[in-house]
Regions:
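Short, functional N-terminal and low-complexity linear motifs
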Residues: 5-8, 22-26, 55-61, 100, ...
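Extended, small-residue-rich solenoid/repeat segments and analogous flexible loops
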Residues: 1-50
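Transmembrane beta-barrel architecture of outer membranes
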Residues: 42, 48, 52-54, 60, ...
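Glycine-rich hexapeptide-repeat left-handed beta-helix
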Residues: 70, 76-179
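Short coil/loop residues immediately preceding or within conserved phosphate-binding loops
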Residues: 30, 48, 65, 82, ...
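Short, charge-rich amphipathic segments
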Residues: 16-28, 67, 87-90, 126
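Residues on the solvent-exposed faces and adjacent turns
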Residues: 22, 28, 37, 43, ...
Length: 179
């Protein structure tokens, strides 16, 4: 950890028992970052402005978090990208989970709810991952999607619509060709 980061943390971190590994980058140039007590932030993580990390959170190696709320006791695996999103209490994200936060057609992100579609007016908006949800490796969540609490997603699922609580996985057919 650089001396500059150590000095910044000494002045700005109020909580105790936070473990921040070497080569972590906390971007202080454009806004505040909040880190709760009893957190572990792995090597080469990049925490960008506007991020709130609640108590007891674990963040894996080389994960980038931008303008997101990570609620208490959530675990975010290595090499994840979490942007403009909320990860609720005790959620678990496996390695390389991605939250997409903008549309390729450059239109504002909207959110579908039971009451109808909310036009957010936001150019960038990620997703909501419900409490105690468990996401397997390489899950991708499209902008404005909601994953209900207690939902489990298997590896490589692409979340294209809101998901009610349940267990979801991809069907794969493995075919042996030749001898």
């Amino acid at each position: 950890m650089s001396q500059e980061l150590k000095n910044y943390l000494k002045l700005n971190v109020k909580e105790k028992n936070i473990q921040i590994a070497d080569q972590v980058i906390i971007d202080k140039t454009a806004g505040e970052v909040v880190i709760g007590a009893n957190c572990l932030i792995g090597n080469y993580a990049f925490i960008r402005p506007g991020t709130i990390i609640s108590n007891g959170v674990k963040i894996g190696f080389a994960t980038e978090i931008k303008n997101a709320v990570i609620e208490a006791e959530a675990t975010i695996g290595p090499q994840c990208f979490i942007a403009d999103s909320v990860v609720a209490n005790q959620a678990y994200l496996g390695a390389q989970v991605r939250t997409s936060n903008h549309r390729l057609d450059e239109q504002p992100v909207s959110v579908r709810t039971p009451e109808g579609i909310i036009a957010t007016g936001c150019d960038k908006l990620g997703c909501y991952i419900g409490q105690r949800s468990r996401l397997g490796v390489q899950v991708i969540i499209l902008p404005g999607r909601i994953i209900s609490p207690n939902t489990q997603l298997g590896p490589r699922v692409i979340v294209e619509r809101n998901l009610p609580a349940g267990t979801y996985s991809l069907r794969q057919e493995l075919i042996r060709t030749g001898d």
